[in-house]
Regions:
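Phosphate-handling active-site elements
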Residues: 152-159, 187-201, 412-425
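Glycine- and acidic-rich phosphate- and metal-coordinating loops
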Residues: 146-169
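DPxDG-like acidic metal-binding loop motif
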Residues: 76-79, 173-193, 407-410
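Glycine/serine-rich anion-binding loops at beta->alpha junctions
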Residues: 54-58, 62-69, 166-181, 391-409
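C-terminal nucleotide
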Residues: 1-57, 82, 86, 90, ...
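Structural signature of FAD isoalloxazine-binding scaffolds in flavoprotein oxidoreductases
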Residues: 71-89, 227
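Alpha/beta catalytic cores of group-transfer enzymes, especially the acyltransferase/condensing modules
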Residues: 193-242, 351, 377-383, 387, ...
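Single conserved hydrophobic/aromatic residue that forms the stacking wall/gate
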Residues: 429-440
């Protein structure tokens, strides 16, 4: 049984090092885990527990390509969500893994979750229907993941959980995808002997977000959180995407991933995200395709006038972004795996430039007074230097965009100064590619 004494004495330090990479994080993480255990006990009483972790993600390349069956280069990051969990036995929930027998009682068949200081949510295993009044709520995600497990023929079960997160909400590190992955990982390990694949958990999470949470999204966020590390994903077959973990470490080249929160939030940007997908799909529809994958730049240029008249300028810009970005991902992977860090950085910078000019997901046209991402990129470029020189690194928007976080790949010896510069307007997290969602 994991206890506060075991954690404080260093009994899980090796696991924590695997999860968080940076040994300077050990003391903080020990305290964090102990606090989570104590909070769980306050809520649900003494007893044996599981602990689970699911990381946030950073998109390295492939901005808004996943929903068009494109390619993505992404990494899970060492900012995560952890859950202290105890299974609750009922007729529907029979554990196949571990020494925990769970407990029966009035809450059998009910998932109970407290997240940090938020009120408890409760989800019945027998009530997993979509409810539009629950859109954009945590309860909707839990219901969606539970329903997804049932639809795929996996077992589901009730549990009590206390969850605490270091993944900033609404900041672009995919807190919702990390949460979906966490719930899926709990159901997999407690009720399916840990045999539900990371890919299945990701697909279930995407379904939960699209159908139950009411937010259109591709599969990149969930796949990166669930599979972990640095990963190349090709969504050409969205039912069975190609997923390759890359044996690459940016740190070996003397660079760090830096995630900067520009303080804006993704919470009110659903329409902006939906517009990108709808406009890309409109251009694809012109060619009698559902998505842009397979459509070439020549196709766009040969039909430029009619596309412009039918759909307007921005649709063309966004379609061209997808076509070029999709090719760029493949080139980024090749540059990384061959050790050509200069070419990789050039491509990352080019990706950010395309997102700014063509994809146009740096700020919302509904709120032009607030442009935190634009300011973050400006400050980064001033410090990092001319993008053609890469004096200290490169930067780009990542993820959904419009608000939240930016990504910078910064020389290790420049990270502290970059932090000091960015902390004037933002909050910077130094990160590394982390492990997949797992039981601790």
């Amino acid at each position: 049984m994991i206890s506060s004494d075991i954690i404080s004495s260093g009994g899980i330090d090796n696991i924590l090092k695997d999860l968080y990479i940076d040994e300077s994080q050990l003391e903080y993480q020990r305290k964090r885990y102990i606090n989570a255990l104590n909070r769980f006990t306050q809520l649900y009483g003494e007893g044996d527990v599981f602990i689970f972790s699911a990381p946030g993600r950073s998109e390295i390349g492939g901005n808004h390509t996943d929903h068009q069956n494109g390619k993505v280069l992404a990494a899970s990051v060492n900012l995560d969500i952890i859950a202290v969990v105890r299974p609750v036995n009922s007729k529907e929930s029979v554990s196949e893994e571990g020494s925990l027998s769970g407990h029966s009682g009035v809450n059998a068949g009910i998932i109970r979750i407290v997240s940090d200081d938020y009120p408890m949510i409760q989800v019945s295993l027998s009530d997993t229907d979509i409810n539009k009044e629950e859109y954009s709520t945590t309860k909707a995600l839990v219901k969606g993941v539970t329903a997804g497990f049932k639809k795929k023929g996996f077992k589901t079960g009730a549990f009590d959980a206390f969850i605490t997160s270091d993944v900033p909400m609404g900041a672009g590190l995919s807190s919702s995808a990390a949460f979906e992955t966490l719930i899926g990982t709990i159901q997999s390990h407690i009720y399916n002997a840990g045999k539900v694949s990371a890919e299945d958990i990701a697909v279930i999470g995407q379904m939960a977000e699209n159908e139950y949470f009411g937010k259109p999204c591709g599969l990149m966020d969930q796949m990166a959180c669930s599979v972990g590390n640095m990963v190349y994903i090709d969504f050409n077959n969205k039912e069975n995407p190609v997923v390759n973990k890359l044996d690459v470490d940016i740190k070996k080249f003397g660079y760090s991933l830096c995630i900067t929160d520009t303080k804006g939030s993704h919470k009110d940007l659903t329409d902006d995200y939906a517009d990108i997908r709808q406009e890309m799909n409109a251009v694809a529809g012109y060619f009698r395709q559902e998505v842009l994958r397979g459509i070439t730049l020549k196709d766009i240029l040969d039909n430029f006038k009619e596309l412009q008249e039918k759909f307007g300028d921005r649709c063309i810009l966004r379609a061209v972004h997808f076509i070029e970005e999709n090719e760029r991902v493949e080139n980024e992977v090749n540059a990384l795996t061959s050790g050509n860090i200069d070419e990789f950085l050039r491509l990352v910078s080019k990706s950010g430039d395309s997102s700014y000019k063509y994809l146009q997901n740096i700020y919302s046209t509904k709120d032009t007074a607030n442009q935190g991402v634009s300011l973050g990129l400006m400050m980064s470029e001033i410090f990092l230097g001319d993008n053609s020189v890469y004096s200290n690194g490169v930067c780009r928007v990542h993820g959904g965009g419009f608000a939240g976080t930016i990504l910078a790949i910064v020389k290790d010896n420049a990270v502290d100064e970059y932090r000091r510069n960015m902390d004037k307007i933002c909050l910077l997290y130094t990160s590394d590619a982390a492990d997949e969602a797992r039981s601790v």
